[in-house]
């Protein structure tokens, strides 16, 4: 159904730079337009632009919690990344940080990524994987985080070793000792699988 809402352009119901998308429980599609710093809601099943939420900031990834509240990942300010994970209220236009950086002395944007995605849906559940840590959070519809799972491993990278991977993509690719990224989370009634 996505092909019926492909609307690149600069018109009022179009988007300039599609960055990410999500679908709510009613089937409405939300598109992040990075160029305009907005989230556009296209109502199911007509696929007409229903609402535009002015975020006012750039970000890498988002997901909808309800029809006007969102999570934003890697939110940028004028000097780089401002917030690792944030709650955006589409009515008040407030952006509130939810997670502090695990390694404040490391600029995560300078460390190569295997996956740009850290927000995962599994059935009715929404999860957030905190990069370079063993932490997987369950996210409520109100944007509240509860640490749900901990990946048990001694192979997590230290802050000093992580610093050595900044702006060193070749080193990042060669390094095989540490868990550096999770590229997928899957859950069944019996198992929780990380890749």
Regions found by a protein language model. Name each.
Residues 43-47, 88-92, 140-143:
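Short loop/turn segments that connect beta-strands within beta-propeller blades
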Residues 176-195:
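Loop/turn-rich, solvent-exposed surfaces of beta-rich toroidal or solenoidal domains
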Residues 28-30, 70-71, 125-128, 192-193:
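Conserved beta-propeller blade signature
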Residues 23-26, 64-67, 121-123, 187-189:
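Residue-level detector of Asp-centered blade-edge/turn motifs that repeat once per structural unit
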Residues 6, 10-13, 52-57, 99-111, ...:
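Surface loop/turn motifs at the tips and blade-to-blade linkers of beta-strand repeat domains
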Residues 37-40, 79-86, 133-137, 195:
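Structural motif
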Residues 15-19, 32-82, 97-106:
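Asp-box/WD-like beta-propeller blade repeats and closely related beta-sheet repeat scaffolds
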Residues 1-26:
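Blade-loop segments of beta-propeller domains
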